[in-house]
């Protein structure tokens, strides 16, 4: 097979132009690294996510990492609890939490479920809980449905 240098150059230039023009391969405007494939598959570098204060609760911060446009059925984000922080919450959605660092405690009905780095905690819809930590916690949360705020 005889391929001309001009054809190779043209193909390489098109590939480079496409890669540079494709926002999915660039960090999102979210202040953290998120890359999205045209198929809809996306990846977030969780160690680049910087959480923001949540609801005026001292020591609690979070950051949603996907939009409803990116993931219309499931929501996701990162939450941090600092040095003994806790807050009360009633879930009108199902939630999975994956502990990334520290210790996450879910207090419910006088009992406590505790997870550490790598552990997964499931909290069913309708649960009235306290998110808590004896030291600190950083965890990824995944919620269904994504538009849980509209669930009432």
What are these regions (language model features)?
Residues 81, 90-106:
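Short, conserved beta-strand element in jelly-roll/cupin
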Residues 109-126:
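Short acidic-glycine-tyrosine-enriched beta hairpin
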Residues 78, 91, 108-110, 133, ...:
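Residue-level recognition of conserved beta-strand positions in structured domain cores
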Residues 1-7, 21-22:
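Intrinsically disordered, low-complexity regulatory segments in eukaryotic proteins
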Residues 125-149:
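Ligand-binding loop in jelly-roll beta-barrel domains
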Residues 12-75:
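A short, N-terminal "cap"/entry segment at the start of jelly-roll beta-barrel domains
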Residues 112, 147-152:
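Alpha-helical scaffolds that organize eukaryotic protein assemblies
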Residues 59-91, 125, 147:
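Conserved short histidine dyad/triad with adjacent acidic residue
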